[in-house]
Regions:
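Beta-strand-rich solenoid/repeat architectures in extracellular/passenger domains
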Residues: 39-41, 45-51, 58, 62-70, ...
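Glycine- and acidic/polar-rich repeat regions and solenoidal domains
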Residues: 153-155, 214, 218-235, 240-245, ...
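Outer-membrane translocation/initiation segment of Type V secreted surface proteins
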Residues: 4-7, 392, 409-584, 657
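Membrane translocator/pore-forming domains, dominated by Gram-negative outer-membrane beta-barrels
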Residues: 156, 228, 263, 271-273, ...
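N-terminal segments that cap or nucleate solenoid repeat domains
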Residues: 34-78, 82-83, 478-481, 485, ...
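Right-handed parallel beta-helix/beta-solenoid
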Residues: 56-61, 74-81, 94-106, 116-127, ...
Length: 809
C-alpha cells in the first residue's frame, strides 16, 4: 500500500481515560505519518496484496484500488475514489458499502460492490462501468430497515444548486428484499433518485425484489429529476418497474430508449403516487418511450390526478402494450404503437401521422376514454364482432371536442355479419365533432361489407353493413334543367320506397369468389366421349391415344344484383386405351386431367374486387362400346384441387376440395341425306353426370367460417348433333359438325358464411351452340377443334374453344 500526505501532523483526538495508552502511542508517531484508511488531502493506492481495510476520504483525497479489496469507503468534499478490478464489501454496522457526499467522485471499472452505493446529495458523481452491485439480504446489518442498490438521496445539507449524477454503464445491480418486514419504498429498491440525474445504459441490468427505480423529490426545491434508460433492462419484483412518489412539487423526466426493457412485477411500467406520497404536492411526470417495446401499464393514482400531470410520448417506433390510467396527455407518433390491454383513460390524446392506437387484440373489448382528441393522420384500430347494432366492439369515447383527421381500421372478431340499422358505435363524441375519421382498408364479416358513417344526429361514428347512396340531384336542387315537376293533380305514388338512410346490406366480393370457385370445381372435369375420341364416336380398329386442350370463359349473373362474376377455366386431358374388344367396338382406357380456374368477383357498389383460384388434377377410367350408329360410354374420375380467394386489402384464404365425378352417355346416329360427296347424319345424345364434391370447412383470417352447400348432385345434357362426312383431295376424312346442347344442373350451388347461405345464381338451364370440324388422316392421326357459345338463365354467358389430337395404332 502506498500512502502520501501533505498534512504537517495529525489532529489529536479528544483524550479519554480508556484510550490514554493509544493516544500516547499516536503522539509518538513522526510528523507527516497518517493512519491507514483515513485520508485528509492525501492519496493512497491499494493493491491485491494489501490488507483489507475501511477508508475515509476528505479534503480532495484520492483512493485508487487496483486489483485489491477494501471494506466500507466514505468519501466527501472533492475526494475521488477509483476502483479498477476491485472489490468493496460492506462490513460492521455500516448500512452501505460506499458513502459519498459533497462533491466526491466514484469511478468503478470492472469492479464488484457488495452493499449499497449511497450518494448524499451535493454535486457528487458516480460512474459504474462493467461492474456489479449486489445487496444480499443475508449480508445486511441485523435490524436494517433498507436495501437499495444505488441511492441518490439527501441526508445532510441540501442546496438547490446541487445536481448529483449517476451513470450505470454496462453494470449489473441486484437488490434483495429484507427478510422481515419488507417496506414499500426502502427495501428491495434497485435504484433510488431523490435528487439529480441517473443514466442506465449500454446493456446495464437492474434487478430488484421490489421496485426497479424509485424517484421521489424530498425537498420543495428538488428541481427536475431525470432518469434515462438506454439499451438496458430494469426489472422489478413485487412493485412497479419505475415508481414516482411525489412528496413535494417536482418535475420528473423519464426516458426509456434504444431497445430497453422494463419488466414490471406488479404489471406497472410506471406508477405515480401510492402510499407515502404527500397530498397537495403538484407533480409533472414526463414519460418518453423512444425505440423501445414495453409491456405493462402506465398509471397516475387517482389521488394525484388533479394535483399533477403524467404525460406520455411514444416516438421512433416505440410500442407499449398496456393500459394508460389517468394519463394527462398521450402523444403517439413516429411509427409508434399503443396496444391497449384493458380500458384506459387519457386527458388529451394526440395521434400523429404515423402513430397507431390499437384498442385491443380481439380477446376482449376495451374502451378508451379521452377528454379531447386531435388527429394528424394516424390510425385507430378497433376489434369488432361484426354483426348487428348490438355487436360487441372496442370503443373510443371522446367527452369533449374531436379535431383533425384519423384513419380507422376494423378487424372482425368472429362476427357473423348482419344487417344493421343505426350501426355499430365505434366513436362517441360529447363535444364538437369536427374530426374526420376515414375507414382504412375493409371491414368484412360473414358475407357482408361494412362502412364507416358519421351520424348526423349525435356526431358519433358508426359501422353499417350498407353503402350510402348518392342523393337524388332533383331532391337537392329541384330547379335543375333535367328535373321535371310532378303534376300535383296526378302525383306518383311510389311503391316500396327504399330508405336512403338505411339501404340494404352490402355483399363483399370475396363471397362471389367462393361461389365462382365452387362453380368451376363442378365444371372442370366434365366431358363426353367425343372429347376423348377427337370428335369420333364410331367403332374403329386399334388402340387410340389422345390429348385435348380447352378453355372456357363464363360470365355469371350478378349475385344479389351486386357482385359480377367472371370465371376462366382451362384444362389439359391425356388418355389412352388399355384394352380393345369386339373387333374395335369396345374399348377401355385411363385418363388424366390437369385443370385450373381463375375467377374475378367485382362489386359495382363498392368498387372492391376479389379473385378466386382453383388448381388441381384428376385420374380416371373410361369404357365405351359403339357401332356405326349407336354408342354408349361411361367414365369415372377422382380429382383433388387447391382453392384460393384473395380480396382487395385482405389476407389470402386457402382451402382444399376433392370430388368424384362419373358419367353415363349414349347416342344414336341417323343418316339424313347427302350434299354432294358429303354424307349428313343427325345424332341425338343424352348424358347424365353425377358429382360428389367435398370442400373443406374454412375459417378465414377474420373469423368467418365458410362452408359449401349443395355442391353434389345429378346433372344432365341433351344434345342434337348434325355432322357431315366427306373426303379431301388428299384422301383425309373431313367431318364438320354443329351441336346444340341443353344442360340441366340439378345441384343448386351455394356457400354458407357463418351459417348464412348465399347462392351463386348459377343457371339451372343452359343452352349451347357448338361448331367445329374433325380431320382423320390416313396415318392414324386425327385432329379436331371447335368453338361454342352458351346462354343460360339469369343472363349467364359462356364461350369455349377446344383442340383435340388422337392417334391410333
Amino acid at each position: 500500500m502506498k500512502l502520501s500526505s501533505v498534512v504537517s501532523s495529525p489532529r489529536p483526538p479528544t483524550p479519554h481515560r480508556l484510550f490514554r495508552s493509544l493516544l500516547l502511542a499516536l503522539a509518538s508517531l513522526p510528523a507527516g505519518a497518517v493512519l491507514a484508511g483515513d485520508l485528509d488531502d492525501q492519496t493512497a493506492e491499494v493493491g491485491a496484496a494489501d490488507p483489507i481495510e475501511a477508508w475515509s476520504l476528505i479534503n480532495g483525497s484520492q483512493l485508487t484500488v487496483n486489483g485489491g479489496q477494501t471494506q466500507h469507503i466514505r468519501a466527501g468534499d472533492t475526494s475521488v475514489v477509483n476502483l479498477q478490478n476491485a472489490r468493496v464489501v460492506r462490513t460492521g454496522l455500516e448500512r452501505e458499502a460506499i458513502y459519498l457526499y459533497g462533491e466526491a467522485t466514484l469511478v468503478a471499472n470492472s469492479s464488484r460492490i457488495d452493499g449499497s452505493v449511497f450518494i448524499d446529495s451535493g454535486n457528487t458523481s458516480v460512474t459504474l462501468k462493467d461492474s456489479i452491485v449486489v445487496v444480499d439480504a443475508a449480508q445486511l446489518v441485523p435490524g436494517a430497515n433498507s436495501s437499495i442498490g444505488v441511492d441518490a438521496s439527501i441526508l445532510s445539507t441540501w442546496d438547490s444548486q446541487f445536481t448529483p449524477s449517476v451513470v450505470l454503464d454496462g453494470t449489473y445491480v441486484r437488490v434483495d428484499d429484507l427478510h422481515s418486514p419488507p417496506r414499500p419504498f426502502t427495501t428491495g429498491i434497485g435504484a433510488r433518485l431523490v435528487v439529480g440525474q441517473m443514466d442506465i445504459l449500454n446493456g446495464s441490468q437492474v434487478v430488484a425484489a421490489n421496485v426497479g427505480a424509485l424517484l421521489m423529490g424530498e425537498r420543495v426545491d428538488s428541481g427536475a429529476l431525470r432518469l434515462d434508460i438506454n439499451d438496458s433492462t430494469l426489472q422489478s419484483g413485487r412493485g412497479a418497474a419505475i415508481q414516482v412518489i411525489p412528496r413535494f412539487a417536482s418535475t420528473y423526466n423519464i426516458t426509456v430508449a434504444n431497445g430497453s426493457h422494463l419488466i414490471a412485477g406488479d404489471g406497472n411500467l410506471l406508477r405515480v403516487g401510492r402510499d407515502g406520497a404527500v397530498s397537495g404536492s403538484f407533480t409533472d411526470v414526463n414519460f418518453t418511450v423512444d425505440d423501445a417495446r414495453l409491456s405493462g401499464d402506465v398509471r397516475l393514482d387517482s389521488l394525484f390526478a388533479t394535483m399533477g400531470s403524467l404525460n406520455v410520448a411514444l416516438r421512433n417506433k416505440a410500442q407499449i402494450d398496456g393500459r394508460f390510467i389517468n394519463v394527462t396527455r398521450a402523444e403517439i407518433d413516429g411509427d409508434s404503437n399503443w396496444l391497449m390491454t384493458g380500458d384506459s383513460n387519457v386527458g388529451r390524446l394526440s395521434l400523429g401521422s404515423t402513430g397507431t392506437v390499437a384498442l385491443g387484440n380481439g380477446s376482449t373489448f376495451n374502451t378508451l376514454t379521452a377528454d379531447t382528441f386531435t388527429g394528424n393522420g394516424g390510425t385507430l384500430l378497433f376489434n369488432t364482432m361484426l354483426g348487428d347494432d348490438s355487436s360487441l366492439t372496442d370503443k373510443l369515447v371522446i367527452n369533449g371536442d374531436a379535431n383533425g383527421q384519423a384513419n380507422v381500421r376494423v378487424l372482425n372478431a368472429g362476427g357473423a355479419g348482419a344487417k344493421t340499422d343505426k350501426g355499430i358505435e365505434l366513436i362517441r363524441v360529447g363535444g364538437a365533432s369536427n374530426a374526420q375519421f376515414d375507414l382504412q382498408g375493409r371491414a368484412v364479416g360473414g358475407q357482408y361489407e361494412y362502412f364507416l358513417f358519421k351520424d348526423a344526429s349525435d356526431g358519433g361514428w358508426y359501422l353499417r353493413s350498407a353503402l350510402a347512396g348518392a342523393p337524388d340531384p332533383c331532391v337537392v336542387d329541384p330547379t335543375l334543367p333535367e328535373c321535371r315537376p310532378i303534376d300535383p293533380v296526378d302525383p306518383v305514388n311510389p311503391i316500396d320506397p327504399i330508405d336512403p338512410i338505411n339501404p340494404g346490406p352490402v355483399l363483399r366480393p370475396e363471397a362471389g369468389a367462393y361461389l365462382a370457385n365452387q362453380f368451376a370445381l363442378d365444371q372442370l372435369l366434365r366431358h363426353g366421349l367425343r372429347d376423348r375420341q377427337g370428335g369420333s364416336a364410331t367403332a374403329a380398329d386399334g388402340v387410340r391415344g389422345w390429348t385435348r386442350v380447352d378453355a372456357t370463359q363464363s360470365r355469371l349473373s350478378a349475385v344479389e344484383d351486386q357482385l359480377y362474376l367472371r370465371v376462366d377455366r382451362s384444362r389439359l386431358q391425356l388418355g389412352a386405351d388399355v384394352g380393345v374388344f369386339d373387333n374395335g367396338r369396345g374399348r377401355v382406357g385411363v385418363m388424366g386431367t390437369v385443370a385450373q380456374s381463375s375467377a374475378t368477383s367485382h362489386s359495382e357498389l363498392t368498387g372492391y374486387s376479389a379473385r378466386g383460384k382453383v388448381e388441381g388434377g384428376a385420374l380416371g377410367v373410361y369404357g365405351n362400346w359403339s357401332t356405326d350408329a349407336l354408342y354408349m360410354d361411361a367414365s369415372a374420375q377422382r380429382g383433388q384441387f387447391r382453392n384460393r380467394v384473395q380480396g382487395d386489402g385482405l389476407a389470402e384464404e386457402r382451402y382444399d376440395s376433392d370430388l368424384w365425378q362419373s358419367s353415363l352417355e349414349a347416342g344414336y346416329r341417323f343418316n339424313i341425306g347427302q350434299i354432294g360427296s358429303t354424307a349428313l347424319t343427325l345424332q341425338p345424345e343424352l348424358q347424365l353426370v353425377y358429382t360428389d364434391a367435398n370442400t373443406d370447412v374454412h375459417s378465414e383470417a377474420n373469423g368467418t367460417v365458410v362452408r359449401a352447400l349443395g355442391d353434389s348432385g345429378l346433372s344432365g345434357r341433351a344434345g342434337l348433333r348434325l355432322q357431315g362426312e366427306g373426303r379431301s383431295a388428299a384422301g383425309a376424312s373431313v367431318s364438320p359438325y354443329v351441336v346444340a346442347n341443353w344442360y340441366r344442373d340439378g345441384a343448386s350451388n351455394g356457400m354458407a358464411f357463418d351459417e348464412e347461405a348465399l347462392n351463386a345464381s348459377v343457371p339451372r338451364n343452359r343452352y349451347e351452340l357448338n361448331a367445329g370440324a374433325r380431320v382423320d388422316f390416313r396415318t392414324g392421326l386425327s385432329a379436331s377443334s371447335g368453338f361454342g357459345v352458351m346462354r343460360g338463365d339469369h343472363g349467364c354467358r359462356e364461350a369455349t374453344a377446344n383442340v383435340s389430337v388422337a392417334y391410333k395404332w
